[in-house]
Amino acid sequence: DKAGNSIIRPDARYAEMTLHQMWEVSYLRIRNIRIQGDSAAISFHDPEAKIQFERPWPSPMYNCEHNSPFFISNALPLLDKPGEWYHDIRTHKLYYMPRKGERMDVAAPALETLVKFEGTREKMVDAVTFRNVNFEVTTWNRPSYKGHVPLQAGMFITEGYKLRPSIDRVNNHKLDNQDWLGRPAAAVELRYASRAVFDSCSFGHL
């Protein structure tokens, strides 16, 4: 497709940019790529585009050799090495280039949460025991549909902006970043619970 003198890449429809930023890594769904001469302008989907460009911190991280702190993935033309894959969201197909001698057995998770107990302050979940249970293979779908712009520890930002004026702190830099956070889905969730015991259990591929 063409728009003016620029070219819009159709194979960028489901591509993602992985952006390394100091203490966290963001995943931005690419909306389109406009190529003009030797330059390319990339735009992203919301809500991650709005969050990424409104928050002041953290910023992209360059090293002394000016290596690029980002890369693009999930585009079929980039599938060129064993171990790489491409997910076509429109056709619900997964393309994978296997490594030499690799078995093609697949465990494809469908659930975000395997076990959930939710009580109230007045009536708590009480005295629950899990023994010799393997909790394995869950997924987290939000980044596929809303991108992922975290603050740290995997907690995603729902809104973030620069404080004006900033808050002065003694012996420290000015505090000028304000974020609202959400927590990723968990394989096991307990709310308002007491005396919950996990005995000889394992957690993996979550």
Model-derived regions, located:
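Extracellular polysaccharide-degrading/modifying enzymes targeting complex plant/algal/animal polysaccharides
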Residues: D1-Y192, V197-G204
